[in-house]
Amino acid sequence: MTLKLYCFGESGNSYKAALSLQLSGLDWEPIFVDFFKGETRTPEFHRDVNTMGEAPVLVDGDYSLTQSGAIQDYVAEKSGKLGGTNPEERREILRWVLWDNHKLSSMAGMTRFLMNFLPEDKRPQDVIGFNLGRLKAAYSVLNAALEGRDWLVGDSISNADISCCGYLYYPEPFGFDRKDFPNIDAWMDRIAAQPGWKSPYDLMPGSPADRA
């Protein structure tokens, strides 16, 4: 049965789930969520898709699951890939997913939105400046963790890597330049070399160009 992922191209959290599905080899298809026209805020979406009013949402037959980290864990369990080779690795993957959700993706997603998807006169520069400082610290942690190693956990790509790269391939500015972090730069090349890898706007429907 084909898994369905409610998602949209601009969403780094959707990209984490989509890329896990893509690299796992499971059969899946994207279902476009028109976030910028308010679809996730409609009563119908809350009733029929996700009571939390968010994307991504994974649907596997009669079962549905929300939150990118939970979806990634489900994909690993279902496919036998990306989830580590032993309990210690699985916990270490979880540690990185939780760190990413709190320290990296939450800051990157909000900062990218404020810097690119709000009208220029509505962009809160003080908030953006604060966020950029937090992001620089997070990038430094990630870059240090990759010193002397190819992957964050174990000897192959895992959901730890996919979670932490979720926003880093986007072209819009949000305080990240690969050349400033050589270990991250090389790591992103390794991820992009994985069979089936695609960039966010190639993997999922929806992009800023659609609204231009």
Say what each PLM segment does:
Residues 1-129, 143:
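GST-like domain detector, emphasizing the conserved glutathione-binding G-site
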Residues 15, 38, 188, 208-209:
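Generic structural signal for helix capping and beta-alpha/helix-loop junctions
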Residues 30, 84-85, 155, 180, ...:
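A generic structural-conservation signal
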Residues 35-36, 160, 205-206:
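Conserved beta-strand edge residues that scaffold enzyme active sites
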Residues 76, 167-168, 201:
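Active-site-flanking alpha-helical
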Residues 88, 96-195:
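GST-like fold's C-terminal all-alpha helical module
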Residues 197-212:
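Terminal-tail/helix-coil boundary detector
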